[in-house]
Structures are given as structure tokens and as C-alpha cells.
Design a protein with these regions (language model features):
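Generic beta-sheet signal
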Residues: 20-22, 40, 88
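Conserved alpha/beta core of the MobA/IspD/sugar-nucleotide pyrophosphorylase nucleotidyltransferase superfamily
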Residues: 47-116
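Conserved beta-loop-beta/alpha segment of the NTase-like Rossmann-fold superfamily
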Residues: 1-33, 50
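Short, hinge-like loop/turn segments at secondary-structure boundaries
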Residues: 7, 34-40, 104-106
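Short secondary-structure boundary/capping segments
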Residues: 9-10, 38-39, 77, 86-87
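Short, charge-rich amphipathic segments
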Residues: 1-4, 37-41, 96
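Short, flexible, basic/aromatic active-site loop/helix in glycosyltransferases
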Residues: 29-55
Length: 116
């Protein structure tokens, strides 16, 4: 979806940092180490982060130099330093391919979009 990149380039102009994402559809549960549910976050405020993640180069470079906390992505690094990050609309088909199951899903999306 070329619109994702265009939305990202527009969003990054607001604060120098922007991440694609989609509103979550699932109910998310917080769970203790013992497996007990400890909370249910408000789904209306939860988005699943995707790529692209777009940053002004100098801002990202500085974050990599200053961040000392463990983080899962560059956006979290900027968040940990107190810098705002803008979320922009991605697409549910824009999945992260990490496992063989993900690859099967991605292949289905590609076949459906190209009418194979």
C-alpha cells in the first residue's frame, strides 16, 4: 500500500518520529508471572506497531547515543527519552514476517492482492 509511506512522510513532519500501526481488534490482557490476569487495557487506546518507522536522522542518532534502557524498537527508544512519536495508520495486511506461520499468511495476502 503506497499510501502507508505517504502517511508516514506526512506524520514524521509533526515531531520527527512516526510509526505505522493499526488499532488492535483483540482484547489484550495483562498477566502476572504466575499467569493471573491483572488487567485489561482499554482497547480503544491500543494500536499494534508496524513498519515503516520513520525518523529524522539526527534525532534517531541522538537517541541511539543516549538510550540506556532495554527497548524493542527505535520508537520505544525515543519514547524512553521523552520524545513524542506520532502513530499513523498502516494496514492490517502489513504484517511482520517472523515465523513460518507469518510467511503463510503473507503469501495469502499477496495471492489475494494479485489475483493469483
Amino acid at each position: 500500500d503506497p499510501g502507508i509511506l505517504q502517511r508516514g512522510l506526512t506524520a514524521v513532519q509533526e515531531c520527527g518520529a512516526a510509526v505505522a500501526g493499526v488499532p488492535v481488534k483483540d482484547t489484550i490482557k495483562q498477566v502476572s508471572p504466575q499467569g493471573q490476569i491483572t488487567g485489561t487495557p482499554d482497547r480503544d487506546r491500543l494500536w499494534a506497531a508496524q513498519t515503516p518507522q520513520i525518523f529524522e536522522y539526527a534525532l534517531l542518532w541522538q537517541a541511539h547515543q543516549r538510550c540506556t534502557q532495554p527497548v524493542t524498537d527505535d520508537a520505544a527508544m525515543l519514547e524512553s527519552l521523552g520524545h513524542p512519536v506520532k502513530m499513523f495508520l498502516g494496514a492490517y495486511e502489513n504484517i511482520k514476517v517472523t515465523t513460518t506461520d507469518d510467511l503463510v499468511i503473507a503469501e495469502r495476502f499477496l495471492k489475494a492482492s494479485s489475483n493469483i
